[in-house]
Amino acid sequence: MISQNNKGYALALFEIANEELKLEQYFQEVKKLNEIINENEDLVKLLSSKEIQLEKKLKILENIFTNHFTVNINNFLKLIITNNLFIYIKSILKIFLDIASKKLNISYGKIYSSKKLDEKIISNLEKFYSDKLSKKVEMLNLIDTTLIKGIRIEIENTIHENSIKNNIKELQKSILEKEQ
């Protein structure tokens, strides 16, 4: 029931964005909102609290978000708060972003490396895979201390690996096959 509600709110926002021909704008705003929400767990708790009056929650929302988001995004957030669903905001935003990214032909990938990669390298990898997959690819760099050197890239459930760790695995596999 709750997940259907979440999907319903996400779909409603998606339909409004589509009708207004502003899906890209809404997508960027919701991405920014999602980052803010994920970085401020206390805000989610505050705006989800049943002990704080609705008027106070709406005032908090207004003070924080009014100058940063369009009227429709702010109204959407007010509706979520008014219906006591802010505890599910992360799920609602994720569903919207998933639906919108499919419509906008955007894929997400993860670059695992032993150390933080330079933004230029990430940008070059995004461009390379965007061209290869014929869609926009946005990547997040994650640190994996088990990698000795090299990178592992995951996009759309496909793994592209060029690392010493993987090379050692392949060598072991090859040796074992030759022994049989």
UniProtKB/Swiss-Prot annotation:
It comes from the Bacteria. Keywords: ATP synthesis, Cell membrane, CF(1), Hydrogen ion transport, Ion transport, Membrane, Transport. It is found in: Cell membrane. The keyword Phosphoprotein does not apply. GO terms for molecular function: proton-transporting ATP synthase activity, rotational mechanism. It is a peripheral membrane protein. GO terms for cellular component: plasma membrane; proton-transporting ATP synthase complex. InterPro entries: ATP_synth_OSCP/delta_N_sf, ATPase_OSCP/dsu. Belongs to the ATPase delta chain family. F-type ATPases have 2 components, F(1) - the catalytic core - and F(0) - the membrane proton channel. F(1) has five subunits: alpha(3), beta(3), gamma(1), delta(1), epsilon(1). F(0) has three main subunits: a(1), b(2) and c(10-14). The alpha and beta chains form an alternating ring which encloses part of the gamma chain. F(1) is attached to F(0) by a central stalk formed by the gamma and epsilon chains, while a peripheral stalk is formed by the delta and b chains. This is ATP synthase subunit delta. It comes from Mycoplasma mobile (strain ATCC 43663 / 163K / NCTC 11711) (Mesomycoplasma mobile). The lineage of its organism: Bacteria, Bacillati, Mycoplasmatota, Mycoplasmoidales, Metamycoplasmataceae. The gene is atpH.
